[in-house]
Curated annotation (Swiss-Prot):
[4Fe-4S] cluster binds at residues 82, 88, 91, 184. The active site is at residue 411. Residues 11-69 form the TRAM domain. The lineage of its organism: Bacteria, Pseudomonadati, Pseudomonadota, Gammaproteobacteria, Vibrionales. HAMAP family: 23SrRNA_methyltr_RlmD. One of its GO terms (biological process) is rRNA base methylation. This is 23S rRNA (uracil(1939)-C(5))-methyltransferase RlmD.
Length: 466
């Protein structure tokens, strides 16, 4: 049968400038307003602001727009601290006061949880409280620290331009182009001090064209520099690089491939946490905010209400950032991670800190982990700290273990809200919810939620107001 071509109708986006008033921020820091009963997302606008905008992406349920002109500014709007804020893609909330950022993120987190998990939460509440009116959950005071110079990890892009000049900096907003960075207001001060000599080194290398990107880390035993390169350095370039490492007293790694790194100068980096020493590789994930990480681990320990007889399961455990501090208060902690190398690192860290009650295993966390050998003994407390994609694959298996308490640490409130529904449908109560100010000046939102089995919920509840 012959098939006839039927051209699809071209969707025409209305590009006329429209006036909009912003009501709130979403969980990524974009302003939300409404036109013709449709939600419009606009980067760079704050609640209460009025602006002329132009639609850039028109969907059936929502649209995105860009600012043409601000007409009314919010009292919370401030001058960005960074001179290249309008160009750099690293931060997107420097135009909002730090207090305003914290309040907006806390509200966005609460709104998401009420929207996506509220129905199940209300059902559990009514069943347990005899239809009495009460708060859905305790919204605790956000964990905050310094608003500037908090970031102990950063990745810088390097490119030899057509004009022969070396570009060294961060990616521009919504672009692969590089904006040159001399100083960064969210980068740790010790790493900012390293930028001028590092730029000078890179500019003198003959192999500039073969540079990949540069990673900087502030470890507790020194500054770490990782140089990725596509071809081997010449002997002359290697001499310059080693001289730089010695003069600046940095821990230097070279990475000829995405998988291989080589320690060239200095010792294995580590950071201290709760009187523990955690060694890591530049390839490993560590939390970027040292102070918030410390408070976050303390809060997780408190929320789990650890007892000497507890057996704790730490899923997505990484190199032991939660597992090892938790092991100081529990009978046993089992950490599970999908990456072999991280499991090896966590095991070494447990041995280094003489924590014999912490053991680590590699497993695919999308599969039924309850069938694995280490899950034969029961766990009464569970902690999860997944990546942005969340823990959809493991949630059904978490409830099979029937823990008394579950602490979920999230870097994406949307997946936290989604995954929470599994626990709520199985009779767990969302007891506490808190925002962790891990990434000031950006729209990234870290959070922590506590779920408790219905029979373990205490009758007295205190709701913390911001």
């Amino acid at each position: 049968m012959a098939r006839f071509f039927k051209p699809q109708k071209r969707k025409i986006t209305d590009t006329k400038h429209k006036e909009i008033v912003i009501n709130r921020l979403d969980h990524l820091g974009a302003g939300i307003g409404h036109l013709n009963n449709k939600s419009i997302f606009v980067d760079g606008l704050l609640p209460g602001e009025k602006a002329l905008v132009q639609i850039t992406d028109d969907k059936k349920q929502y649209a995105r727009a860009k600012v043409i002109k601000r007409l009314i500014d919010s009292p919370a709007r401030i001058k960005p601290h960074c001179p290249i804020y309008d160009q750099c893609g690293g931060c997107n909330l420097q135009h909002l006061s730090h207090q305003g950022q914290v309040l907006a993120k806390q509200q966005a987190l609460s709104d998401l949880m009420v929207k996506f998990a509220g129905d199940q939460q209300v059902a559990v509440d009514k069943q347990r409280a005899g239809d009495q009116q009460r708060a859905l959950f305790e919204q605790v005071t956000p964990i905050i620290a310094a608003e500037h110079h908090y970031r102990r990890c950063a990745r810088f892009s390097v490119l030899l331009g057509k004009d022969g000049q070396l570009q060294f900096g961060l990616r521009k907003k919504q672009s692969k182009d590089i904006v040159n960075v001399k100083q960064c207001p969210v980068l740790a001060e010790s790493l900012n001090e390293l930028l001028p000599p590092l730029r000078s080194l890179l500019s003198t290398l003959k192999g500039q064209r073969h540079l990949g990107h540069i990673e900087l880390i502030e470890a507790d035993n020194g500054r770490v520099v990782l140089i990725r390169h596509l071809k081997p350095f010449s002997d002359k370039d290697m001499t310059l690089i080693l001289n730089f490492a010695q003069e600046q007293n940095v821990i230097l790694f070279l990475a000829p491939t995405s998988d291989d790194i080589e320690l060239i100068h200095g010792e294995t980096p580590y950071y201290r946490l709760d009187d523990l020493t955690l060694h890591f590789s530049p390839k490993d994930f560590i939390q970027v905010n040292r102070d918030v990480n410390k408070k976050m681990v303390e809060q997780a320990t408190d929320w789990l209400d650890l007892q000497p007889s507890d057996r704790v399961l730490d899923l997505f455990c990484g190199l032991g950032n939660f597992s090892l501090p938790l092991a100081k208060h529990a009978k046993a902690v089992v950490g599970v991670e999908g990456i072999d190398e991280m499991v090896h690192r966590a095991t070494e860290n447990a041995m280094c800190n003489k924590q014999n009650n912490a053991t680590f295993y590699q497993a695919n966390l999308d599969e039924d982990v309850t069938k694995l050998a280490w899950a034969r003994e029961p766990f009464n407390k569970i902690l999860l700290d997944p990546a942005r994609a969340g823990a959809a694959g493991v949630m059904e298996h978490v409830v099979k273990l029937k823990p008394e308490r579950v602490v979920y640490v999230s870097c994406n409130p949307a997946t936290l809200a989604r995954d929470s529904q599994v626990l709520l449908k199985k009779g767990y109560q969302l007891e506490r919810l808190g925002m962790l100010d891990m990434f000031p000046q950006t729209g990234h939102l870290e959070s922590m939620a506590l779920f408790v089995k219905a029979k373990a919920v205490k009758k007295k509840r205190v709701v913390t107001k911001l």
